[in-house]
Every structure is written in C-alpha cells, then in structure tokens.
Amino acid sequence: MIKASDIYNRAKQLAESTNETEQRECIKTLYYAVLHKIQEVCDSKELPRTRAANLGSHESMIERINVQNLPSEKQIVSYAKKMKKKRVDADYILSLNINNKDVQYQISWAEKCWYLLDRQ
C-alpha cells in the first residue's frame, strides 16, 4: 500500500522536468499528495467523515482538517484550496501555459501544508 509521502515523492521527481506535460502532472500529483496527507492525519485523529451538502468530495476532505478552526487548520485549508485551483488549471485548461513558476507555487503550498499537517 502506498502513502501520501510516496505520491509526494513522485511529484518532486516530476518537478525536475521542463516538459509542460510533466509539469502539469506534477501540479496534479502534488495536490493529490496533500489531499491524501490530510486524509491520513484526519484518520489518525479519528475525525468524522462527514460531507456537507454544499461541498464536493474534495472540498469535504479538505475541510475535514478544520475541526477546531485553529489558525494552522485554516492555513492548511487555504493552501489546499489554492492547490486545487492550480490543479484544475493544469488538468483542464490546456490553452493555459504551465511552466516552472506554476510548479514552484504548487511545491511551496504543498510544503507548507505538509509542515503544518506534520504538527497536527
């Protein structure tokens, strides 16, 4: 069985590429690594799996970490939502030029999420 860290490590490998297809894949993979890291932390804390009627499945997974409304939890949610937007751009807007700058933003947000999640 793989872990979120395995997905994260694969994304970091993709980040070394200058190929736009691999940069898009990196952006997507970093998002999913963080999403699974959130899920791992929430599961380890035995947080309930509830899905709000007005949220999609990814939004519900992201919001699950925000149980006490602490600043660190809010930051994780904020970064993860930024990552989701970047992932949607990379996956669906093929006319958009994706480059190393976009990859670096996604890496930065992922690292911040990872740091905060490791301290939950």
Spans of features found by a protein language model:
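Terminal alpha-helical segments
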Residues: M1-Q120
